[in-house]
């Protein structure tokens, strides 16, 4: 673990500095982009400082890649935020990116440096197989966009899959939702990549129970949990909400379970250093 300091100023600016020589060294900077603006700016400054200190390789390890939901121009006069963040990281000086469960796989193509895209599936699969009886399990996705993810889990577990089809009024507000498939008497596992305000995931859970599901759990890689997410989870029919620790979750809910991906990240860093394959680290 290297030594560095961050100095904060009265006007809100900050400066970073390395407290030891990193000349000719391979530097791995571990920083999720949440909270988004400050963490991203700090990461960019760390990258720039490492480059100016003559580091050999600079790898940004970003378990949660913010702005990933802005991956396309889906209406007039909007930015493609994910592409901009990729450009900023590359311009700052990274030589590689390690990230996990991108909202859209194609974001890897926004970078001109190698991207190692990890998946939390191996960590989640171990937890599922140890804690959830598979004979009555159904995997569900809270929206059509997550069908590929849910299908991979269902296929790997050998269980059926159902889909929640939703229409939105606007961002973070769901207008209508219906189930495609049968959940009567089943233990449902909802899988997603990001839970922000928890509107979609909790409405999906309540709809599953309304349609006869025996129980509903949810599993997502990244806990953004903007207000009123914790309240919604607590008041919903979810029996458990499972996240990784890609983001810090401090608000607290008795229903929330955090599973660490520290070993997954550490092993990926080790394999980058030893030039080994990373794809074998995850189940799918």
Q: Where are the regions that the model predicts?
A:
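PRPP-associated nucleotide enzymes
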Residues: 1-284
């Amino acid at each position: 673990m290297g030594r560095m300091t961050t100095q904060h100023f009265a006007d809100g600016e900050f400066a970073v500095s390395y407290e030891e020589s990193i000349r000719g060294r391979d530097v791995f900077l571990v920083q999720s982009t949440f909270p988004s603006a400050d963490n991203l700016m700090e990461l960019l400054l760390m990258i720039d400082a490492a480059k100016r200190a003559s580091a050999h390789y600079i790898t940004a390890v970003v378990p949660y890649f913010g702005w990933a939901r802005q991956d396309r121009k889906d209406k007039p006069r909007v930015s493609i935020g994910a592409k901009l963040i990729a450009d900023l990281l590359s311009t700052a000086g990274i030589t590689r990116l390690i990230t996990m469960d991108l909202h859209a796989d194609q974001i890897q193509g926004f970078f001109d440096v190698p991207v190692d895209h990890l998946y939390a599936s191996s960590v989640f699969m171990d937890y599922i197989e140890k804690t959830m009886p598979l004979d009555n399990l159904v995997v569900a996705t809270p929206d059509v966009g997550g069908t590929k993810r849910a299908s991979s889990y269902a296929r790997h577990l050998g269980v059926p899959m159902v889909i929640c089809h939703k229409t939105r009024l606007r961002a973070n507000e769901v207008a209508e939702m219906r189930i495609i498939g049968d959940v009567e008497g089943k233990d449902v596992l909802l899988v997603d990549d990001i839970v922000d305000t928890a509107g979609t995931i909790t409405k999906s859970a309540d709809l599953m129970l309304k349609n006869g599901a025996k129980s509903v759990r949810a599993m997502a890689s990244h806990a953004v949990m903007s207000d009123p997410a914790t309240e919604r989870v607590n008041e919903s029919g979810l029996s458990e909400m499972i996240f990784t620790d890609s983001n810090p979750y401090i608000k607290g809910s008795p229903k929330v379970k955090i599973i660490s991906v520290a070993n997954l990240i550490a092993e990926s860093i080790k394999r980058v250093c030893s030039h080994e394959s990373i794809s074998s680290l995850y189940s799918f």
